[in-house]
Amino acid sequence: MWNDTQMTEIVIPPVDWRVATQLSIIFGWASVLLVIALFVPRSRTRIVGYLAMVGAMVAAAVGIPLWGVNAETFSGMLRLDSYSLTLNWLFLAAAAITMVLSLDYLPRQGIERSEYYVLVLFATGGMMLLAQGADLIILFLGLELLSIVLYVLTGFAYPRNASEEAGMKYLLIGAFAGGFVVFGIALLYGATGSMNLRAIGETLAQQTLTLEERIYLLAGAALVVVGFGYKVAMAPFHMWAPDVYEGAPTPIAGLLSVGSKAAGFAALLRFLVEALAGEWQIWAPVLAVLAIATLAVGNIGALTQRNVKRMLAYSSIGHAGYILFGVIAAGAPGGIAGQRGVEGVLLYLIAYTFTNLGAFGVLIALEHRGEAAWDMSDLAGLWSRRPWLAVAMAVCMLSLAGVPPTGGFWGKFYVFTAAWLSGMGWITVIGVIVAAIAAFYYLRIVAQMFMAEPAREVPLPMDRALRAGLALATLGVLILGFLPTPAIDLVQRVVLGG
């Protein structure tokens, strides 16, 4: 029997619900919608979509009074600061635009089901966990939640074989990525005795690790980076991206290219800067080589594509290389380079989110004929057939190319400047050269739309929801380009702590 001396009191630490407010709204509302969806007939699926968007907007609005909060809860595992709050807003915006674009797409493709919108909300919650995670366990939980939901959404267009194949490929490769992260976490815990990112960084700064422990730490860190490298489609862990993007439902391909990538970089940046800042001299050159390899693979692959959806997949790989420039700079010792690195990553992700969602939105508008709408020839003479669509696609292509005055220009400018200030001038020069070469395949699409002979087919009219989603994405790109000051002020305040 137990006696009083053997009993230990269990103390539950207080919970700061400000930190978990947005997460609670998203997960709670998604769970409610899952029940509501059971009673909504298939012909009224849009109701669930509208309700899901309301939940995303409420979660975003609730975050406004939380600006300036810098707090942790659940024993330091979950953190809310200006960095994570900004990324949460970005994820919620991406989810809302994705759902708007899906309202017309799903019924046209015959895959309209209520659970689609619920799954998008759960995916958004996974992204937010990756942004707010201050502990390796939370980062892994967010990674797995996001991945599992996206496996389902990628294969959502069953019984279309391409979608099922894409879902299976993503599942198999994602499982390997998760395995790398788990092994990496085990080694990091074995070396430092902690899973908290700041605690790992403090242990490393004290220089009390033995040689064996330091080897375990670096090996564990490498495995975690490999795992997140799969998530952001960083070379040589990019192999899944073209096939998965092509086979996935087009709105989900857009969400994969922006939300999943942004969440992966959010976690990777926090991990490297907080836990491994003391080893910058080791991991920065390695990431620099991987960044150049990612640029090369992505842009060379995109140059050879006639399928616009696959081209955007390779383009997404290439853009991961540019974002890595900012990640490298963010961990650099000294003030200005690190600050500019974080600013560059955030600004690039904001611009890239609106740009890529707009580009995929145009493909959705043309997809009434199935896969043929993804061929370069389907864009021929688009200016004559649908001027508004041609302008939207041109704006997005120019932004992806980094042409001023679009949002993409400011993103590239900041990450290139950050890399230069960090002492990595050689990757900056290579990045500028590659960006100039990459402009060819973006401008090729613009020329196809405005200068080629128009196709004979008469396109179907666009749904109002699709028009609204495209307008939001395109206006976001233009506003970031012509009026960048608010976005720049926002990311600068993030670095300065609000």
From Swiss-Prot:
Topology of the protein relative to the lipid bilayer: Multi-pass membrane protein
Protein's name according to its UniProt entry: NADH-quinone oxidoreductase subunit N 2
Source species: Roseiflexus castenholzii (strain DSM 13941 / HLO8)
Record note on quaternary structure: NDH-1 is composed of 14 different subunits. Subunits NuoA, H, J, K, L, M, N constitute the membrane sector of the complex.
Family membership noted in the UniProt record: Belongs to the complex I subunit 2 family.
A GO-annotated cellular component: plasma membrane
UniProt-recorded Gene Ontology molecular function terms: NADH dehydrogenase (ubiquinone) activity; NADH:ubiquinone reductase (non-electrogenic) activity; quinone binding
The reaction(s) this protein catalyses: a quinone + NADH + 5 H(+)(in) = a quinol + NAD(+) + 4 H(+)(out)
The protein's role, per its UniProt record: NDH-1 shuttles electrons from NADH, via FMN and iron-sulfur (Fe-S) centers, to quinones in the respiratory chain. The immediate electron acceptor for the enzyme in this species is believed to be ubiquinone. Couples the redox reaction to proton translocation (for every two electrons transferred, four hydrogen ions are translocated across the cytoplasmic membrane), and thus conserves the redox energy in a proton gradient.
Lineage: Bacteria, Bacillati, Chloroflexota, Chloroflexia, Chloroflexales
